[in-house]
Amino acid sequence: MSTPENTLVTPNTSDTIPTASAAKRYDIVVTCADGLEAPLQTELSHMDISHELKSTGRIAVNATLEQIYKICLWSRVASRVLLPIKKRNINKEYDVAEQLNGLARTVDWTEWFELDNTFAIRMSVDKRVQVSQQFAMLRIKDAIADTFSEKLDARPDVDSNNPDFPIYATVNEKQAEIFLDLSGTSLHRRGYRVAMTDAPLKENLAAGLLYTVGWHKTKNSYSALIDPMCGSGTFIIEALLMHCDYPVGIDKAESQFGFYNWQEHDSELWQQCVVQAQERFHNGLQKAAAGKLPTILGFDADAGAIKAVHKNLIAAGLIELIPHLTLEQRPLSQLKIALAKPLLDRKLKRPLVITNPPYGERLGESDFIKPLYQGLGLTLQEIFAKQKYQPMLGLLAAHVEQADVLPIEDPQTLRCHNGAITVYFRHGQLIRKEGESLITRFEKTEIKVDEAQDFVNRLQKNVNHLKKLAAKEDVTNLRVYDADLPDYKVAIDVYGDYVHVQEWAPPKSIPPETARKRFNLALMGIREVFGINREQIFIKTRARQVGNTQYGNPEASAQSKESKNAPEPKKDNRNRYKGNKFQQAREEAKRQEAQRLAQKKRKMHVVQEDGAYFYVNFTDYLDTGLFIDHRNMRSMIRSASRGADVLNLFAYTCTASVHAALGGAKSVTSVDLSQNYLDWGKQNFALNGLDVTTSRYQFIASDIFDWIKDNTDQFDVIFIDPPTFSNSKKFQGTFDVQRDHTALINRAMNRLANGGVIYFSNNFTKFELDEELYDRYEVTEITSETIGFDFNPKKPIHHSFEIRHKL
């Protein structure tokens, strides 16, 4: 019997088979993974089976024999179906194994199974109960064997793999219970997982989560399922099995269920249930193969994962559907490209995006999980920005705070277990992407600001002019004012929805009170021009000042680009280990807590540039993490990187490295003296769906001169963006770009492959490239190409060059 398309794909009362056994009912226990109680109850309700939640992971069920068979055949969420044999209260303070032995001895096992039947013991023990599980199972086995010895003078054999009579025991703090395991083995084993990837998702957990987001309700509830990190394809396969009305227990029907040697087993009724289930699946599969199938898209960065999906689909009996599926090796960074055609073909009207990301177990770099999740959310918002329906989004996370960055409306969180691992399923509808950035939604209006009208007029004029250029080049991070007026010596940069204001220290000839007043007037004018609140403006100073005239973060002053790669100051450890070990431990704990709190205070914002996302910090460093004057340079590097080995020296937060990776670089190596900045760079990689654990992407904390001297690799593209001045281990203890650039470039050229290119840039306004380099290499100044439309080409903020080997 086939199931109508608009009905649930679980059994219903219309499938009931008339039988003499139908009247008798049994009290059983159906278990599931923690957190899946609600989906399991939904299943049981649609089977018209009486049930009651007893405790975490346990549902008490009153069912007929036919209903028991149908639970074993059809339940996608259940773990085990257990028939109670005996139970007793226990005292966990005493020997629990011996109490279990005593409980088993109260059962006449010869009335339950025959001597020539094999048996096995499995059990679950509450973690609060101290007992050796192996020893406890051994003591239950001893009791059963002794019962047969006393009655029949012989013992039944044990078969741990495929017993005729599987016994299951449970122990909690107050009670022990012994069951006949009617399911035989855990019902999550569907039989199709012939190929696996790291940290696979359990089948019944995947099904329960699909229930949670409503995939099961009707065959028309979603138009598509998208799994951007599909692994071995568990979500995809479980979704297809639901759609095709597949009885998930059918592969166990031959020999693996635990009720075959139960005295109440009705083999004729069982065969009727099996035949009916097979017919339903056959009908469902034929309809799906004929085209009545939602759009299914699965992607993974690992080619082996996609091969595993194909193997598992074949093992699940779904080979006919493979031509109708999209299964591609694609990293998360290519999700926009992957979904472009389905969107164009209008196949993603009501999509479900559900995935099991590498939440730490698969990735191994837990610090970069949150950026990965945040980047996925931002990417989906961009992809579906112009669609009528926003997708339903469901993701697993190892820690609930990892999922907090997902842009989900009215988010729901389900705590559950994937095997022994506690995970959190965050789900809800994707929040539609917010409107345009500050620069694109700017409208020139009449604004009056007493005493600062000239500043307001100039700022409005600048923004109005830049708006058109920004729209043309799709730029949202740009400089809109650069000390244009002598009385207002500030640089104003727009980063998406935020304004970053840098005040240049006024000359000593201007009284501090006057400087402060002008600056406050400028801030007032900025708020009026952009129509923003105080929280969207961030203020910095580019030089240290005395007393209370310091507007920026004094600790950030040394973090400017001109000293970004200076070694971090050495800590004074002279008093660190004074006193006893207890005092040392306390001091170390305080230090770690202070470090944790400082890290927590750092507020990162995300901005977009040319299809890439970057973290910027407006408060803790003088520079933000993204040098907007190098926007065009990063675009050049991206264009030159396809199939190339790329080296980024003085990598800072690795923004150029991200563009190289997104541009299709074969490999990207980022070298910087600061591990903190490299970690920031790794977060930028993760934010863009780039796997920071792959050998393709290297992050090396090292002195640049030491590294390029010792390294022997060859690179096709090298980007060098050194500070103007820095303390360094080389060159008399300092680095000066004018003095030392020749030696730096010569060493870098030793690492440049034939046909490769070095992009060299620096921000020293009076910089002149050594004539010796023009003679030795093919050098082209490209400053005019790398200066953006928002900077003055007559006063270039940087100087840049292309350098190649001479032919």
Curated annotation (Swiss-Prot):
Start-end of Polar residues biased regions:
548-560
Query: What is the top-level taxon of the source organism?
Result: Bacteria
Where does this one sit in the cell? Cytoplasm
Main localization of the protein described in the UniProt heading: cytoplasm
Question: Basic and acidic residues composition bias: which ranges?
Answer: 561-575, 584-594
The alphabetized UniProt keywords are: Cytoplasm, Methyltransferase, RNA-binding, rRNA processing, S-adenosyl-L-methionine, Transferase
Entry EC no(s): 2.1.1.173, 2.1.1.264
**Which organism was this protein described from?**
Psychrobacter sp. (strain PRwf-1)
Say which family it is in.
Belongs to the methyltransferase superfamily. RlmKL family.
> What is one term from the GO cellular component aspect held by the record?
cytoplasm
Report the protein's function: Specifically methylates the guanine in position 2445 (m2G2445) and the guanine in position 2069 (m7G2069) of 23S rRNA.
Concerning InterPro entries, the annotation shows: 23SrRNA_methyltr_KL (IPR017244), DNA_methylase_N6_adenine_CS (IPR002052), RlmKL-like_Mtase (IPR000241), RlmKL-like_Mtase_CS (IPR053943), RlmL_1st (IPR054170), SAM-dep_methyl-trfase (IPR019614), SAM-dependent_MTases_sf (IPR029063), THUMP_dom (IPR004114)
Q: Which residue spans adopt a coiled-coil conformation according to this UniProt entry?
A: none
What Gene3D superfamilies does the entry give? Answer: 3.30.2130.30, RNA methyltransferase domain (HRMD) like, Vaccinia Virus protein VP39
- Per the record, what are the reactions this protein catalyses? guanosine(2445) in 23S rRNA + S-adenosyl-L-methionine = N(2)-methylguanosine(2445) in 23S rRNA + S-adenosyl-L-homocysteine + H(+); guanosine(2069) in 23S rRNA + S-adenosyl-L-methionine = N(2)-methylguanosine(2069) in 23S rRNA + S-adenosyl-L-homocysteine + H(+)
PROSITE patterns attached to this UniProt entry: THUMP, UPF0020
This chain belongs to which protein, by name?
Ribosomal RNA large subunit methyltransferase K/L
Segments for region (Disordered): 548-602
Q: Which NCBIfam families is this protein grouped with?
A: PRK11783.1
THUMP domain residues are 67-182
- Pfam families from the UniProt entry: Methyltrans_SAM, RlmL_1st, THUMP, UPF0020
GO MF entry, a single one: 23S rRNA (guanine(2445)-N(2))-methyltransferase activity
